[in-house]
Amino acid sequence: MKEKIPFYNEKEFHDMVKKTKKGTFSGWYIIDKDNNSVEFSGKFNRQFKLNKPVIPVNTEYVTRKEFNEYKNSNDQRLTKIETTLAAQGEQINKLTQTVEKQGEQINQLVQVVLLHGEQINKLTQTVEKQGEQIKELQIEQKAQGETLKLILQTLQKMSDRLDKMEVKMDKMEVKMDKMEVKMDKMEKRIDKLESK
């Protein structure tokens, strides 16, 4: 990472110019810590006050103090971001665990639903069997109804015959009564004849 550092006096600047052997330079040099090299840019401002360079207006460079303040504020921001990211990571872990638990619950509910589906299928089969049994019973009931009708018709015929027989019996009883009357008369005649 390159760090921008100001010259604190002209001698330091000229020493750096001699080391790098480049033309005229600004009052800033950049140290590349990775390559151990020094770079310059722009024009050198020779106005030094209290061993600090005068930064030209509209310059893109800052003082070491400003740079350190900026760096510190960035470090604080990075720390806050890291803290926030860590908290968000924990929240993500908790959410992941919650999602996994919900996934397990969903799997359990799916199994319950499948079991209910199987039970419903069994109940449907039972209802279908009962429906078939009801149809068979209805057929048997119809057959029994027809048999009962035949029996009732037979009984009705027998009842009609019995009625006819009763009528005949009544007629026979009437005839028997008449015959008894005749028999009584005959007995009386016989008695009369015997008494003579």
Swiss-Prot record:
Q: Which InterPro entries match?
A: DUF16
Offer one Pfam family short name for this entry.
DUF16
Q: Which domain of life is it from?
A: Bacteria
Provide the family line: Belongs to the UPF0134 family.
Q: What is this protein called?
A: UPF0134 protein MPN_501
Which source organism? Answer: Mycoplasma pneumoniae (strain ATCC 29342 / M129 / Subtype 1) (Mycoplasmoides pneumoniae)
